[in-house]
Amino acid sequence: MAKMKMIIDCDTGVDDALAITYILANPDIELLGVTTTFGNVDLDMAAVNSKLILELFHKGEIGVYKGASHSRVSDHYERHAKSNAIHGDNGIGNVDLGPMKGKIEEKNAVDFILESARQYKKDLHLVFVGPLTNLAECIEKDEAALKEVGDITIMGGALTTRGNASIYAEANIISDPLSAKIALGSSLDLHLVPLDATHKTLFRVSDIKEWKDINEAGKDLYEIARYYYVRELGGEETGGAMHDPLAAFASYDPSIITNWFACNLTAEESGRTISYFEELNLPRKRHHVALDVDTRRFTKEYIDLVTALIKNN
């Protein structure tokens, strides 16, 4: 059976790195490339961090492609203090993975995504786990090509729970609400994995303690994850939410989500993801939103796969 082809678009901080690691660990997925944007860190740091994670697991031949450096509602990038606190100065828990051995690709992220969409069509799954600026540009350039892919999954939004950037807003959406509005207002069928589901996937330091004793790669990944788990929600045994890994997992296996809610959403300037009255009764629902998750299965399968990747490194 052919492997599922996947591209992940990310702003590589800690949970992005853990999502890339999951894709590498899954033997049924072929990671075609990593595209990057601003968000947890700036564009250049996101690209370098992505390459360093690939190289950590001897997959440096996989290309990293840079996209948007700032949102559509600003002319520059400014890092939020919360991102620095949660992800560290370097975005990967202040762990030094050494100098990058390879190079970042010259091709733009949007061009790479669209070329891959045209080539692989239904065999390709696209996972967007940062601000949606690259996705919005893809839609404006060739929405028809995106309609042919097998799946588009977004980590973003908050429907039944408060946001993590404001009472309403989730960080990826508020980082570029105009691009989010373009994405949600398109004709594309989208899967959204919001905080409603990801905040039910809390990993604790004790869940991954085995990694640090396997080898150097395991120790590095453990330290990257530990930095985040201790800081995101307030303590070592509270844990950290696996936002981006859950989105990648759900794109591969949607059954991990136990409640998909069908609706039509938009993004407001405030970063709120909401449905307007005019959309409520439309027969076609473009968006399927994850509201609940099989946390036990997700935790076990994620840790088992990544532990095996570390052991085989």
For the regions a protein language model found, what residue spans apply to each?
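Short secondary-structure transition/capping segments
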Residues: D44-M45, Y77, F203-D207
